[in-house]
């Protein structure tokens, strides 16, 4: 006889293991260095700006940004990857202009000089990254 569990009712979370806010990334040679410069780039370009994304939540961050800027959807093109690491590889390779992925995925590449951190999609500063624009 099989035991049927309704996991949503049978288990309770006991700890938050990890939290990694989303971050906006660019190739180190990009002229964009801050969220404000990214906004100006999106508004000024005649063609869509490409964002490599590795998940649905990442796409929502880009959609939220464009809605706040009150720009049409044709100003930004999101390119879906199988995951955030693959998305960042194409930014580092110069194939895609920008990316939105968790900060924990991209920051080691910043330390290696292969990626530029433009800003964080967070309401509060992150420990160790207090100088990064929000």
Please report, for each region that a protein language model flagged, where it lies by residue.
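Hinge/capping helix and adjacent helix->loop/strand transition within the periplasmic-binding protein
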Residues: 1-86
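C-terminal lobe and pocket-closing loops
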Residues: 9, 19, 106-134
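Well-formed, non-transmembrane alpha-helical positions, independent of function
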Residues: 13, 37, 89-90, 108-109, ...
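A conserved hydrophobic position in a structured secondary element of the catalytic/binding core
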Residues: 26, 101, 130
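Short helices/loops that flank or line small-molecule/ion binding pockets
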Residues: 42, 64-68, 85-99, 104-112
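Paired acidic/hydrophobic, glycine-rich loop segments that form the ligand-binding mouth/hinge
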Residues: 52, 97-101, 116-119
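Histidine- and/or cysteine-centered catalytic micro-motif in compact active-site loops
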Residues: 54, 84, 103-104, 121-123
């Amino acid at each position: 006889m099989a035991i049927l569990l309704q996991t949503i009712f049978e288990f309770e979370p006991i700890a938050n293991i990890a939290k990694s806010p989303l971050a906006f990334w660019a190739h180190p040679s990009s002229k964009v260095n801050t969220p404000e410069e990214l906004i100006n780039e999106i508004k000024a370009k005649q063609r869509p700006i490409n964002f490599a994304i590795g998940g649905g939540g990442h796409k929502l961050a880009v959609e939220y940004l464009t809605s706040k800027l009150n720009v049409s959807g044709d100003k930004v093109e999101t390119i879906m990857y199988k995951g955030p690491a693959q998305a960042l590889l194409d930014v580092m390779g110069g194939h895609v202009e920008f990316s939105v992925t968790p900060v924990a995925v991209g920051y080691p590449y910043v330390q290696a000089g292969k990626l530029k951190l433009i800003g964080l999609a967070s309401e509060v500063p992150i420990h160790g990254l207090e100088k990064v624009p929000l």
